[in-house]
């Protein structure tokens, strides 16, 4: 049996699905680490969990390492430790290194999590990236606005999806957006030029450096528009066929990005704009 440790700080609906599927894999003995008590899981999922450790902070590498070692004492040598939410990838990678387990390294995880670092790496490799800058104070933000022009996108450097993301159309709205974005970024804020066009996501699975599955979906309208207008019911359109020439540039850029950022095995999700 392979002992797999799954980390889910909270038992969201999505987390429950991943826990159930992982625990049901042939030859897997599942150990679970969470902040939520195990009783929060439905009985049919609890029955699949071989060991559970509750921690105070599911995003802290020290807590994860300690809990994983408890599971190892109970179930035997660990094979993998994993989780699916974006915010947990860096502490997971650090725990993985300390436990001597295979998987994505902390350096690679940081390249995906830190959007400034990611954009710098992609731009250096010749991939198309919106002009951006990490700023600490309002003066630096206003200088960038003077260089690039409005509108701007304002967000934390390590945000997820469109959380704490704002559009600034002038100096006043930029100052206001900086306050909101700082709440999710520890002080530093990432500014980007506002690129108009059609927004797509590029998702896939990669195993030992080879892409085994990929898909393209189209956001209609763009997520930032939805964040600014909560009444909008947006759509994610998944074409049945993704071999059309219209998607060639997106797929080529997405595959190239994986090589630049160093992902060898895993699932990934990236967003792309096609300029109008």
Question: Which role does the model predict for each range below?
Answer:
Residues 1-108, 113, 139:
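ATP-binding N-terminal substructure of ATP-dependent carboxylate-amine bond-forming enzymes
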Residues 20-24, 183, 207, 219:
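Short, solvent-exposed amphipathic alpha-helical segments in soluble enzyme
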Residues 49, 77-78, 150, 211, ...:
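Local beta-strand N-terminus motif with an aromatic residue
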Residues 67-71, 144, 177-180:
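CheY-like receiver
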Residues 71-78, 146-148, 184-185:
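Glycine-rich phosphate-binding loop signature in dinucleotide/nucleotide-binding domains
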Residues 97-165, 171:
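A conserved helix-loop-beta module that forms one wall/lid of the active-site cleft
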Residues 128-131, 151-154, 166-201, 227-236, ...:
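Conserved ATP-binding module of the ATP-grasp superfamily
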Residues 195-200, 204-263, 267, 274-276:
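ATP-dependent carboxylate/phosphate-activation module, predominantly the ATP-grasp catalytic core
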């Amino acid at each position: 049996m392979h002992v797999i440790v799954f980390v889910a700080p909270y038992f969201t609906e999505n987390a429950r699905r991943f826990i159930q599927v992982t625990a049901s894999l042939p030859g897997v003995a599942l150990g679970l680490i969470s902040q939520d008590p195990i009783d929060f899981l439905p009985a049919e999922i609890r029955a699949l969990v071989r060991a559970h450790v509750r921690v105070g902070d599911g995003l802290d590498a020290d807590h994860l390492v300690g809990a994983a070692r408890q599971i190892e004492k109970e179930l035997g040598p660990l094979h993998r430790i994993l989780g699916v939410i974006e915010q947990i990838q860096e502490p997971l990678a650090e725990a993985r290194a300390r436990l001597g387990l295979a998987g994505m390294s902390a350096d690679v995880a940081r390249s995906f999590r830190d959007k400034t670092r990611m954009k710098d790496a992609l731009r250096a490799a010749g991939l198309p990236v919106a002009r951006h800058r990490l700023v600490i104070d309002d003066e630096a933000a206003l200088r960038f606005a003077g260089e690039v022009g409005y509108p701007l996108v304002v967000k934390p450097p390590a945000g997820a999806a469109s959380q704490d993301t704002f559009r600034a159309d002038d100096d006043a709205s930029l100052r206001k957006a900086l306050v909101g974005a700082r709440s999710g970024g520890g002080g530093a804020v990432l500014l980007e030029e506002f690129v108009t066009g059609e927004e797509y996501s590029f998702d896939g699975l990669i195993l030992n450096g080879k892409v085994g599955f990929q898909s393209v979906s189209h956001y209609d309208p763009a997520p930032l528009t939805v964040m600014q207008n909560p009444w909008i019911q947006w759509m994610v359109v998944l074409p049945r066929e993704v071999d059309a020439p219209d998607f060639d540039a997106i797929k080529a850029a997405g595959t190239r990005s994986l090589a630049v950022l160093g992902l060898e095995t895993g699932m990934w999700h990236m967003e792309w704009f096609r300029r109008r």
